[in-house]
Amino acid sequence: MTEIVKVREQLQISLSDFQEQASLQSGQIFVVGCSTSEVLGERIGTSGTMEVAEAIFSELKQFQDQTGIELAFQCCEHLNRALVVERELAMKYQFEIVTVTPVRSAGGALATYAYHNLKDPVVIEFIKADAGMDIGDTFIGMHLKHVAVPVRTSVKEIGSAHVTMATTRGKLIGGARAVYAAKEETITCR
């Protein structure tokens, strides 16, 4: 099995496992951070390839087609972890669009591939995603809503890259009298 075929298979399993647990809904935002260098067993930022980026992008687009989620591709630290998204998503949520074109050496291979393969791509600096996937320890946490909830899947690595996934939930707020699930006895004021 070639490395690319293995990466595709691992990604398919990981996304399927994730969806079984997280049940993402159409329209929710899914952020992806990825080091294609780490996928190939190299140090982050040193050996990124468009071939690996294409394979990962392709699987993520299939996941999007199946679930209706919106994708956001995190750039590398050289672009302050900005995100590549469809213009329609940026306009819908009034995300501020910034002017930059990701390239493999400043943006990363996956974000660059996404920029050249989305319908109408733009780059934004900030987002609060409903869920996400981190391939190669790229640190997507800054782009997740509070509160992040880790999701464990059967896949621990994509290629040679460590993979983590998370969904989010609303904050539990209040004090000693706060209620988090409506029950008959909590509906009326007494």
Swiss-Prot record:
Family: Belongs to the UPF0340 family.
InterPro entries registered for this protein in UniProt: Antibiotic_NAT-like (IPR028345), DUF436 (IPR006340)
Name recorded for this polypeptide: UPF0340 protein BCE33L5016
Organism (species): Bacillus cereus (strain ZK / E33L)
Family matches, as HAMAP family: UPF0340
Pfam families tied to this protein: DUF436
